[in-house]
Amino acid sequence: MAKISSASCFRAIFLGALIILCLPHPSTGVPLEELERAIAILRVRGRALFANAIITSDLLFDLLSDESLTLFAPTDSMLFDLDMTHSLPFYVSTLRLHSVPLRLSLSGLRSLPNSSSLPTLLPSHRLLLTKHSSSNDSIFLDGVQLLIPGLFDGQHIAVHGLADLLPLTAPSSPNRLVEDSTALAKSPWFLGSRFSPAPEPYFAFMDLSPAESPSVEEVSPSPSWGEGEEDFIVGDEGGPLDGRNNGF
């Protein structure tokens, strides 16, 4: 009788553990809907190529795996020149350099001490935040001015516009090159193409490369979180980040 009880107890524990493992676990990354809104804002505020680059590269999956984000978006013209004049590893490294795995609103950036160091999604590279001593309003990252702060301010994501591209070599260390460019070239994500195999549905859906910009007829002001959300949602069904239609 004792053996039967022990076996039954073991089976109950095993089945309980199996059920727990099979249950869906809540995601710890940024909400998909919030990232959609941020991408929509980038498109109508002169940063469409940065938005295209996010959804047509494996950077999208890196962004979705972080609990919070700050995106520092360069202008379309800057990113277009980069795409035309530099190699694939250099291009992708630059995208990662503009992504910080922390949510930093404008007030959050202003509260940081001068010469603060910010982590990025580019391995072994951090951004140096500096401020002019005469004014707390002028913020620079690796020497590039924060030109349009607060493009998007969500609960998990903040987006700011830059005056230029962030350099892959920090101004204070001109000889410190990015170490992972060669490693990126050997990554199975690329295989001689700008696009990784995983995000191919997004590229097929948009029919755009990062260097192609969709036309924007009207530029809208940046809304605060929760105001006018319906105007900036890419779309729960059929949008570029629609998990059901695009293989999420």
Swiss-Prot record:
Alphabetic keyword roster: Glycoprotein, Proteoglycan, Secreted, Signal
Record bears the keyword Glycoprotein: yes
Signal peptide bounds: 1-29
Residue numbers spanned by region Disordered: 213-248
Family annotation (PROSITE patterns): FAS1
UniProt-annotated glycosylation sites, renumbered to this chain: N114, N136
Record GO cellular component, one term: extracellular region
Domain of life (superkingdom): Eukaryota
Domain FAS1: 35-166
Keyword Signal set for record: yes
Biased segments, Low complexity type: 213-226
Main location: secreted
Compartments, as annotated in UniProt: Secreted
PANTHER family linked to this entry: FASCICLIN-LIKE ARABINOGALACTAN PROTEIN 19, OS02G0491300 PROTEIN-RELATED
Similarity comment: family membership: Belongs to the fasciclin-like AGP family.
Role summary: May be a cell surface adhesion protein.
Name the record gives this protein: Fasciclin-like arabinogalactan protein 19
Gene of this entry: FLA19
